[in-house]
From Swiss-Prot:
Belongs to the GTP cyclohydrolase I family. QueF type 1 subfamily. GO terms for biological process: queuosine biosynthetic process; tRNA modification. It catalyses: 7-aminomethyl-7-carbaguanine + 2 NADP(+) = 7-cyano-7-deazaguanine + 2 NADPH + 3 H(+). Pfam families: QueF. InterPro entries: GTP-CH-I_C/QueF, NADPH_dep_7-cyano-7-deazaG_red, QueF, QueF_type1. GO terms for cellular component: cytoplasm. This is NADPH-dependent 7-cyano-7-deazaguanine reductase.
């Protein structure tokens, strides 16, 4: 597996697909670029999901998150793009992504996006 940023999300088979259980991940080092100023934006991402048949592989998730370092985008658009890519890769029963962006201009921004499967 590569150590370079990548838009590829790898998965593995859910070891207990007959059961609902929740996977929670905290990703404290998300960075992207402000589309207006080009300055870096920093966020902590909280991912919560109930898998169906596949779970996201952690190293590929890390490399995927790194791939946003030089990407410009509004907080709302990037949060929904990441959720959409994760849903496409894993097809979960439920998934929620919460992005807690650091203060910019005296304003903290939190964006929550959800997917309800089944």
């Amino acid at each position: 597996m590569s150590t370079e940023p990548s838009k590829t999300l790898e998965t593995f088979e859910n070891p207990n697909p007959e059961r609902d259980y929740t996977i929670r991940m905290e990703i404290p080092e998300f960075t992207c670029l402000c589309p207006k100023t080009g300055q870096p934006d920093f966020a902590t991402l909280n991912l919560e999901y109930i898998p169906e048949r596949h779970c996201v592989e952690l190293k590929s998730l890390k490399l995927y998150i790194w791939s946003y370092r030089d990407v410009g985008g509004f907080h709302e658009a990037l949060t929904n793009q990441i959720l959409g890519d994760l849903v496409a890769a894993t097809q979960p029963r439920y998934m929620k992504l919460t992005a807690h962006f650091n203060v910019r201009g005296g304003i903290w921004t939190t964006v929550e996006a959800e997917h309800h499967g089944r």
